[in-house]
Every structure is written in C-alpha cells, then in structure tokens.
Design a protein with these regions (language model features):
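Beta-strand-enriched, solvent-exposed domains that form extended recognition/catalytic surfaces
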Residues: 1-110
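Residue-level detector of short, conserved catalytic/binding motifs and their immediate flanks
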Residues: 32, 83, 134, 175, ...
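Fold-level signature of zinc-dependent metallopeptidase catalytic domains
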Residues: 109-170, 179-191, 203-208, 216-217, ...
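Short, surface-exposed amphipathic charged segments that create phosphate/polyanion-binding patches used
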Residues: 192-199
C-alpha cells in the first residue's frame, strides 16, 4: 500500500495545551511520527508519535480497489526560530521511513492567524495550569442552540464516568475538562444505513468504513478549528444520538 503527504497550510492557534518542558516523545507509539528540528543547529526540539484515520482506512477492503485522500493535521508549540518538519510512516517491518519534509519560516506572512470557529467555552472540570495538566476538550455534535444545556449535562456525565474509574479517580486534580458550546443546525448525526442525514458542525457519521457502530468525522480541519477554543491534549466528540457506537 502506498501513501503520500502533501502540504496545505500553516495556522498559528491561540493556545498550546501540552507540556512546555517534556517535548520529546521517547515511546515511539503510533504509525506516524512527527519530528521538528531547529534549522540552525539541526537539533531535535519536538517529536510526537500518532495514528491517522487514513492509515486505518488502508486496512479496509475499499483500499484494495480505490484511492482516497484524508485531511491530516499535526500540532506543535510555535517555534522561536525556523524549523524543519519531518513526518515518517511505519513500514511493514516496523521501521519509520521519512515521507514528508517542510521548512517553516516563523516570520512568514503566509502563516495564518485567523480564528475560524470561535464559540463560548464551558469548564466541566478545571484544576489548574494547562501546561501541567491533562487537558481534554469535549466537542458537541448534533446539538442545536436549544440543546446546549443538554450538552452541558452530557459533559458532566462524561466527567463523572471518567472519574469513577481508576486511575483517573485518584488523579482528578491532574485533569482539566472543557467543552466548546458550538451548536449544529440540526439535531442528531448521520446514519447512512438508515438514510438519515443531518447538517452538523463536525459532519460526523455512523457507518465509517461501512461499520455500523463506527461513528467518526473526516472533517479534520473543523475538528481542529473547533478544539482551538481552549488548550487541549485530547479531543472527544459527544454525539447527540441514542444509537450505540463510537470511534477512536
């Protein structure tokens, strides 16, 4: 199977939710790996392993007969000086092979700074400095403006469920959970197998990869733009539906 990575744009977001000191990923998890090097010294200053929806799609039957593209984003602390970004993919032998390289001029006027999806936010569980916490952002999918109170209540249920389990229960003080109050035009989510289509803010859908219970969004850019309302490490989508399902 073959994959290629193409550059689209650079965007400076208002917040960084990750650590400001622990910047090098030494675990080497995931099927892709981001390395960021200082251009002047060639020193590695940031790295992170991750997985993509595209990689998961490559394992499907559809990938055997057609080609497809997926939006992908990588995030990093905004650098002080010019950097070189390298993205590698894990091959069949488990080794990372470089697929993409791009040099970022930090003074370039092509680095966009627009806030694309600004909405109010809601603190579900806040304990302190984002750089020293695990920051979770909860995004609403298929909640209309009249259903924002329902979304807040569902966010509280999420937090209660998370902190009812170990080791989260013992470490509640190390977590922040925030929600973005972003309404959809219609209530509910897409269920293609039942011919149900909804106009929602993140374009999530059941039947991802033709798996009935798999709900996911291909709209990666909206996902990131909506999350950018708060500092975050992890993104969860709360879907307004009675149908059982999920995805990761």
């Amino acid at each position: 199977q073959h994959d290629e990575i193409y550059f689209e744009e650079l965007l400076e977001e208002p917040y960084w939710g990750g650590s400001k000191t622990n910047l090098i990923d030494t675990m080497f998890y995931g099927n892709y790996y981001l390395n960021v090097y200082d251009v002047a010294s060639n020193q590695l200053i940031y790295s992170r392993g991750y997985c993509t929806l595209f990689w998961e799609w490559q394992t499907t039957d559809e990938a055997k007969t057609t080609q497809r593209c997926c939006s992908e984003t990588v995030v990093m602390p905004f650098p002080k000086n010019d950097v070189r970004i390298e993205i590698s993919a894990r091959n069949k032998k488990g080794k990372f092979v470089k697929k993409f390289e791009y040099t970022v001029d930090v003074d370039s006027y092509f680095i966009k700074k627009d806030r694309r999806m600004q909405y109010p936010t809601y603190d579900v569980h806040y304990t302190g400095n984002p750089s020293r916490r695990v920051d979770i952002v909860l995004l609403p999918e298929g909640y209309t403006a009249d259903e924002m109170d329902k979304f807040k209540a569902d966010c509280k249920l999420f937090a209660e469920g998370l902190f009812s389990l170990s080791p989260y229960k013992e470490n509640q003080g190390l977590f922040n959970i925030r929600a973005v109050l972003a309404p959809s035009q219609e209530s509910g989510v897409d269920i293609p197998g039942e011919y149900i289509w909804k106009n929602t803010i993140l374009n999530s859908s059941f039947y991802t990869f033709d798996s009935e219970r798999y709900i996911m969004t291909y709209d990666n850019k909206s996902l990131r733009d909506l999350s950018a309302n708060v500092p975050y490490d992890f993104i969860y989508i709360i879907a307004n539906t009675q149908k059982y399902g999920g995805g990761a």
